[in-house]
Amino acid sequence: MILESARLDVLPGQEDAFLAAFEQARPLIAVQPGFVSLRLLRCLDPGSESRFLLQVEWERLEDHTEGFRKSAEYQGWRELLHHFYSPFPLVEHFGSDSLG
């Protein structure tokens, strides 16, 4: 199991529009081979209300990097969401063999 973690800094004042677009984009990722689950969390710290954390579980790293990112659905995902970000998200992948 792989956990993709993305810190999303949304343009201030665009949070509601981003959340609406995210709901439209969610089915695009959910149909991907190897997709397991996702959750979107909003930062609670004062002054950081425009920051979100996206966590996506994949069966394998390649399901995200080779599968989803090279799919037609990813193009739709980009069109719906990427214009909300500044700066562009930091995306990292974590494996089950991590310490803990």
Predicted feature locations:
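Short amphipathic alpha-helical coupling segments at ligand-binding clamshell hinges
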Residues: 17-21, 67
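Short, low-order "capping/linker" segments at domain edges
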Residues: 95-100
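Short, well-ordered beta-strand segments in beta-rich or mixed alpha/beta enzyme
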Residues: 2-9, 39-69
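Short, surface-exposed ligand-recognition loops at beta-strand->loop->(often short) alpha-helix junctions
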Residues: 10-18
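General helical structural elements
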Residues: 11, 30, 43-46, 82
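Short amphipathic alpha-helical/adjacent loop interface patches that line ligand
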Residues: 22, 26
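An amphipathic, aromatic/His-enriched active-site/gating alpha helix that lines ligand/cofactor pockets
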Residues: 27-36, 57-92
